[in-house]
A protein has these predicted regions:
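Hydrolase catalytic cores
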Residues: 141, 161-163, 270-342
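Catalytic-core environment of secreted peptidases
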Residues: 101, 110-112, 117-119, 247-289, ...
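Inhibitory N-terminal propeptides of secreted protease zymogens
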Residues: 1-67, 193, 340
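Loop/turn elements at helix/coil->beta-strand transitions in domains of secreted/extracellular proteins
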Residues: 54-56, 94-97, 155-158, 188-194, ...
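Structural detector of well-ordered beta-strand residues that form the stable sheet scaffold
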Residues: 59, 123, 159, 219-222, ...
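Protease zymogen maturation seam
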Residues: 40, 44, 50-105, 109-113, ...
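Subtilisin-like serine protease catalytic core
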Residues: 88-98, 104-118, 125-176, 239-240, ...
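Substrate-binding/access-modulating region of protease and related hydrolase catalytic domains
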Residues: 164-240, 251-254, 260, 278-292, ...
Length: 342
């Protein structure tokens, strides 16, 4: 449950058990992990809480999954080579502070050892912290190994929130509780943009936290998911306020497993991209998760004052059906110096 301000009298007002309480100074909200009694109706409880505290959100502590797969074929390109067709080089990144909410990042990897990374764990419990997904995304964003590998923003500052754990009962997942706390940390650290390469069900608590984050001037970028073209929209990408990203290959063809829909905003490279692997190696990765950081870097650089982020839909390279469509959105993200210049 998420309520405005710093609420202290929740337990005395309702017949519930409070498992955890988090004061979120960045979002100016309070997050509760509560357990209702067996005879309580969650919808009725949510209504009662909303009547007492105002604009609140009550929902299950839903779980979210990462959205990328390793591939056995050789990589098509490095991040910078993949990004060349987006015009990404027209933007600087010196002042960029990137927020990454993902798995734990292997900071011992040669591509990340000397990167400016501040990492914090937000997982409740003792489950194993997976490394693969977050390490890959971090390398695409800020990785650099002399002569071997360079990410999109090697001079940027990365704030990496570890929110995933690996449990036998649920696999590799992140809870809403962890995600909301991570969003609060990002607001506290005044990041320029947040990358959410994950997907799952709708959740009113997560949506409220994302809306408050965006109200603080921080764009949120999310992958649309890899459940296939016939799948229902996945969240958080399907929230109207979030920039939803799909993946295309080196020939600008949509990734065959990408979710489609009217919520889609932009396409970006996301098929067989070279990325770091835990332990020091590199390998090709594919998925809408991999496409998201290409959009994240462009929005982050634009949010430092170089270019208004809202203009990127206008300067995207149209793909597929002319105009907006449910496969590519507005098209391949492109940084044009003036609208229409590509």
């Amino acid at each position: 449950m998420l309520v405005d301000g710093d609420q202290l009298n929740l337990q005395s007002s309702f017949n519930i058990s409070i498992r955890a309480r988090h004061s979120l100074s960045g979002l100016d909200m309070t997050l509760f992990n509560i357990q209702a009694n067996e005879d309580q109706d969650i919808a009725e409880l949510a209504l009662e809480i909303d009547q007492l505290f105002g604009d609140s959100a009550v929902d299950a502590n839903h779980l979210y999954e990462t959205e990328a797969t390793g591939t056995y074929r050789e990589a098509d390109c490095t991040p910078r080579d993949c990004a060349a067709r987006t015009g990404w080089h027209l933007l600087g990144n010196a002042d960029m502070r990137i927020g990454l909410i993902d798995t734990k990042v292997d900071q011992s990897h040669p591509a990340l050892k000397f990167a400016e990374i501040t990492q914090r764990d937000f997982v409740q419990g003792r489950g194993k912290r997976p490394l693969s997904h977050g390490t890959a995304i971090a390398s695409i964003l800020v990785g650099q190994q002399s002569g071997l590998y360079t990410g999109l923003a090697p001079d940027g500052q990365l704030f990496a929130a570890s929110v995933f754990s690996n449990l036998d009962s649920s696999g590799e997942t992140a809870s809403v509780e962890s995600l909301v706390r991570a969003l609060d940390w990002m607001v506290e650290n005044r990041v320029s943009v947040i990358n959410l390469s994950m997907a799952g069900p709708p959740d009113t608590v997560l949506e409220k936290a994302i809306l408050r984050t965006i109200a603080n001037g921080i764009p949120v970028i999310a992958s649309v998911g890899n459940d296939g073209p016939a799948a229902e929209p996945m969240f958080p990408a399907a929230y109207p306020s979030v920039i939803a990203v799909t993946a295309v290959d080196a020939n600008n063809r949509v990734y065959r497993k990408a979710v489609r829909g009217a919520h889609l905003d932009l396409a970006a490279p996301g098929v067989r991209v070279l990325a770091a692997e835990p332990g020091g190696a590199y390998g090709p990765v594919t998925g809408t998760s991999i496409a998201a950081p290409f959009v994240t870097v462009i929005y982050g650089a634009g949010n430092t004052g170089t270019k208004p982020p809202s203009s990127y839909q206008k300067t995207a390279i149209d793909l597929g059906t002319p105009g907006f469509d449910t496969v590519y959105g507005y098209g391949l993200i492109h940084v044009a110096q003036t609208p229409g210049e590509k």
